[in-house]
Amino acid sequence: MKNYAAWLSKKTGKHYRMLSEAEREYGARAGSAGPFPFPFDEGKEYSIAKHANTYGASDGYNFTSPVGSFPPNAFGVYDMHGNVYEWVADCWHDHYNGAPSDGSAWMEEKCELVQIRGNDWGEPPIFSRSGNRNNAAPSDRGDWIGFRVAREL
């Protein structure tokens, strides 16, 4: 993923990088304080299907959906919930004790596991909450994991 950001930076002459875990969550929350930045009918998990690609075809997709298939969030960002987990720049940590307070990525010399945020099309909708986090091996590949880059202005 970092190689892609470096390639894109070289190709365009603009600086691209992977998001930190904190940046990814900030973008997913889009100014909201609750677990979801969109209406969620408790007990009716599939109300999320109007806002994100999650488990089952109630959202119109059996697997991944095309980018922009659901409305953007309050920040104007698309697809922050569901579809695929997003690999972020941070190494996996199972807690926040010692995490950078400036929003930068929490790195180690060598990441045995990487941090992934969001959720994928094969998981129950409850995992679409803005704070959902998980881990993956750096070698993991599949139709359930992707990444997002940021362009520095």
What is each stretch, according to the model?
Residues M1-N134, P138-D143:
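Functional-site microenvironments in short loops/helix caps that host divalent-cation chemistry
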